[in-house]
Amino acid sequence: MQDKYNHTEVERAAHAHWNANDAYRVTEDQAKPKFYACSMLPYPSGKLHMGHVRNYTINDMLTRSLRMKGHNVLMPMGWDAFGLPAENAALKNGVPPAQWTYDNIAYMKKQMQAMGLAIDWSREIATCDPDYYKWNQWLFLKMLDKGIAYRKTQVVNWDPVDQTVLANEQVIDGRGWRTGALVEKREIPGYYLKITDYAQELLDHVQIGNEKATLTGWPDKVRLMQENWIGKSAGVRFAFPHDIRNAAGERIQDGKLYVFTTRADTIMGVTFCAVAPEHPLAQHAAASNAALAAFIEECKKGGTTEAELALKEKEGMPTGLFVTHPLTGEQVEVWVGNYVLMSYGDGAVMGVPAHDERDFAFALKYQLPIKQVVLVDGETFDFHQWQDWYGDKERGVTINSGNFSGLSYQDAVAAVAHALAEKGLGELKTTWRLRDWGISRQRYWGTPIPIIHCESCGAVPVPEKDLPVVLPQDLVPDGSGNPLAKCEAFLKVDCPCCGKPARRETDTMDTFVDSSWYFMRYCDPKNRDAMVAGGTDYWMRDQKAATGGSGMDQYIGGIEHAILHLLYARFWTKVMRDLGLVKVDEPFTKLLTQGMVLNHIYSRRTAKGAKDYFWPHDVEHVYDEAGKIVGAKLKNPAESGDGLLPVGTPIDYEGVGTMSKSKNNGVDPQQLIEKYGADTARLYTMFTAPPELTLEWNDAAVEGSYRFLRRVWNFGVKLSAIDKDAALASVAGAASLKDVQFGKEAKALRLEIHTVLKQVDYDYQRMQYNTVVSGAMKMINALEDFKATDSAGAQVALIEGFGILLRVLYPATPHIAHVLWDELGYAGTLGDLLDAAWPQVAPDALVQDELELMLQVNGKLRGAIRVAASADKAAIEQAALASEDFHKFAEGKAPKKVIIVPGRLVNVVV
């Protein structure tokens, strides 16, 4: 056994053993309780970052600890391999996205293997593999057949220079990220999935306080985010009648402008209506109004998301059209508003400036009437400044509302809804913020949508026997539109219905499709005949009786995926259930959203106003007298936009933030592993903070983790020098420990080890891995402090204690634990550490012969006494009064009273 800890040699030996034994291959074993633990699959961007290291180590600790406890545990891995970054890299480097993607996968896989993760690589998938995305296409066709998938027009971001559609994240300040051209909005056809058909069930299962909720193992924050995204709203949908006619003399939209509101109590305060730029009334008015037409064109610039529109300045223009208020008969002016989305509701909203903050600002800007119709007792309305109470529906009472005056919110809504229904112009209605999922992307690197367009037959599904529709692997995007549209070999095909020449659909699927079911494919990764089968039934089976949930037992990933990915995966699972493919309602029983990894951020403005960022290792902090960081300066020369900056140059300190390439505050896991070893990287990311909280990087703490592992190794070296055979035999047969004569010190060591083990076991169950590591540190402290003797009992206590420590540490630092376990002979008696039984707390070790009680004199701590564990009050009092500490601090005074707190302290009042 080497005297000094060499992480490179230790990790090489551990990997050789695991590889030789195919240690992590898992099969379905009905004799064991199953546990499926999965991290969200990564995008193969090129290198792992510390967030990956933290996520996968959490998963690995769970996997290894449960395997030791007798579970059949699956920890798979794959690659979310389609997507825009590969196209961007191809555009930049002139290589096909496939080549860039697979090169990155190979490198990142090596990094994961270096971490020592217990991944079953036989189940590895890549979503860009035709054997995988074939089933995206297959299920899409099933959805099409069931009416869940359908085709309609959609508004997209269009770059007029590149002649291509841009994702929302590619639109920067209203311009295309590559060309800088002003982005336009265009309506183009695309395929949608009816996620709204599942809105109620999606809400029921996630909603806090709902009796139908099943996702009680999810963080409340995520559940609330999903509930808000689904956005169930109860209100009134009603119409403003009109007589606006098109060129053919027909009333537009049957003479009714529909809106939806949750504030029907304010209907008497309507002073305008606003419609989306694409609304039929807006288009009709623009046909004879050049200024309005120009405004509508201007509205097409910029992004299409609700979030982006919320941040834009609200602008509008009158159409010159009027509709009729359904209850008062007054004429209401129609405006075009850049903040109204055609895809939400009916593409129109009622304007009630007095009681809606957005409408209030709009009315002030364009000098529109403001009519107060709700009053909160004791408040005064100011027509020049918004006050929060204007929108308060809980305390408000209607005023200036004719027959509807003097009503509470609930009563007013009911009365207004009844009046509108009697006129045939409205009804109570539930609406959802959730919209059908548009999956068409005008991109190359994605799953081809299996549709053929024929002039005679229309849009024809690709026959199942012809799946997959394989994406060409060798195309290189040039920035001028979708390469598939120019690839004749892909594009040209005969119609499967009539046999005439036709063309393939060139849109590809949203990459969220790929990640909506991959966790099921891990269960049957090589099945060429079915999307899912027996493996999925086993790993995703209903475990309600045992765990209170169903599906995957534990899912781990970032909270940034709280809405889209997790919501789409839930929807996809429910569709697969309804198609008879799976038997579960929800995909993930428990969810852990691990915290971000943060680091210090340092920057400096250049002479031209640009911002340079500097690596933390080139910077040192400047502190004030109280020790607070007040600035920073360079401790090494560093390049900047102003040239090479010398040591001592002042630098701006921005605090801590998420590790980022753009801010030069990331830490390369590869460099960390090479310098300190994978075990140190793993240990540090687990010890520094609880898994669900953010982790603030600290180089000194990394060094501390490495020193701790050296201490463990050094203790193992000391232990290797003693004769351990008899002690190992005793430890291997737990029953025989009862026959071992433990001395006072050995009993104290066992008490400490087993007390800590009891807490560590609980912490493992809670996935509080930071306190698991703290417990391991307490164990090594106790072992190092133990004054070993040649007695058999002392050696057994040492061997038992260190064996427990190695098993406690193994899930966190498997390499060093494995090598020490082997070198010290534990494997020969207790078996390979891979499947060694989890250590059990020994009840006899927790039984104390003696107790240490704190001694107080007149309430002040003055020392301690030791008494027999069975000592009664009289014996404890006698020991206290006889102690040196009492006589020293009593100063000859007689005791008046002795107060005993059992198991803790004795207070003598003199």
UniProtKB/Swiss-Prot annotation:
Enzyme Commission number(s) from the entry = 6.1.1.4
An annotated Gene Ontology molecular function: ATP binding
Q: What is this protein called?
A: Leucine--tRNA ligase
Quick one: which gene encodes this? leuS
One Gene Ontology term, aspect cellular component:
cytosol
Supply the InterPro entries for this chain: aa-tRNA-synth_I_CS, aa-tRNA-synth_Ia, Leu-tRNA-ligase, Leu_tRNA-synth_edit, M/V/L/I-tRNA-synth_anticd-bd, Rossmann-like_a/b/a_fold, tRNAsynth_Ia_anticodon-bd, Val/Leu/Ile-tRNA-synth_edit
Q: Which organism is it from?
A: Acidovorax sp. (strain JS42)
Q: Motif 'HIGH' region: which ranges?
A: 42-52
Upper lineage ranks?
A: Bacteria, Pseudomonadati, Pseudomonadota, Betaproteobacteria, Burkholderiales
Q: Where is the protein situated, by its record's location annotation?
A: Cytoplasm
> Mind telling me which PROSITE patterns this protein's record contains?
AA_TRNA_LIGASE_I
